[in-house]
Amino acid sequence: MGLKEDLKALEEEAKKLIEEASDIGKLNDIRVNYLGKKGKIKSILKTLGKLSPEERKEIGQLANRIKDELEEALKEKTELLKKKALEEELRKNRIDITLPPQWIESGSSHPVISTLIEISQIFISMGFSVAEGPEVEKEKYNFDMLNIPPDHPARDMQDTFFLNNGDILRTHTSPVQIRTMLKHKPPIAVIAPGRVYRKDADPTHSPMFHQIEGLLVDRDVTFRDLKGILKIFLESVFGKDTKIRFRPSYFPFTEPSAEVDIGCTVCGGKGCRVCKGTGWLEILGCGMVDPEVFKAVGIDPEEYTGFAFGLGIERIAMLKYRITDIRLLFTGDMRFNQQFKGIR
């Protein structure tokens, strides 16, 4: 068999292998075996020196044609295999839009968070700013500078969480007011929302709960201003027809001090189990800032007056949404939260 026949035989052999190849790796092997530097076609061409010039030209042209055709065949088969691989990948990852969707349970805003946001927005609309502070607090800011003496019951280990280094978990957000007055000079109008901690746990109390306190300090601030602000707030939360009353009370950091009640939201003031037959619900504490507190933060009580108030967010949420057990607010049960979805 001559060189021409050998080349044509290699051509047919290579084209058959290319046609049968099932992956790109096999095509690469064919390229190396037939077209590589040590491939079969190259081996045949090494014998061209034994031929006459006319035969070398003819065989050379034939070899070049075969190489070009094999390269083209390899290219086409490579593109075909890549296309098939892509189609297979798309087939495997195809989304069947006829399948019923997987149910994804959606959450909803927690009633405490909803209430906190609502209350904050009411006071912000009246010109108050939001102030924040640390939850791990110094006794100095939590008690001493708020005119709470060392022998006060609130400072007992039965009521306060004390840490090993002498710090405490804040029992109210009043320390934020102290820090604000130390940092800023009057006029001051801030609310301080956040988590607070007390050793108490029953259906109406939690060792951790949310509180929001307010402080306004300026010249000529009166108790009438305090009553007006709280009236706007309570009517915004519970409705324009809400009955409100102020009762004299005592807090170490305010003087005079008052407790604020609203007409029972359950019985309408007629008397029920929730209001214990009184027709009233205790809602918050308030008062005029004690001069001793002003002195502790370097504000002249002869020049400035101010008022402060504080309330529990959980308390407001329970009254607004008629929740009977505070522990329900901390279960993390989505079924409970979803009851309040879309309710404001």
Swiss-Prot record:
Transmembrane segments: none annotated. Its EC number is 6.1.1.20. Binds 2 magnesium ions per tetramer. Its cofactor is Mg(2+). Tetramer of two alpha and two beta subunits. Belongs to the class-II aminoacyl-tRNA synthetase family. Phe-tRNA synthetase alpha subunit type 1 subfamily. Mg(2+) binds at residue 255. It catalyses: tRNA(Phe) + L-phenylalanine + ATP = L-phenylalanyl-tRNA(Phe) + AMP + diphosphate + H(+). This is Phenylalanine--tRNA ligase alpha subunit. PROSITE patterns: AA_TRNA_LIGASE_II (PS50862). It comes from Persephonella marina (strain DSM 14350 / EX-H1). The gene is pheS. InterPro entries: aa-tRNA-synth_II, aa-tRNA-synth_II/BPL/LPL, Phe-tRNA-synth_IIc_asu, Phe-tRNA_ligase_II_N, Phe_tRNA_ligase_alpha1_bac, Phenylalanyl-tRNA_Synthase, tRNA-bd_arm. Pfam families: Phe_tRNA-synt_N, tRNA-synt_2d.
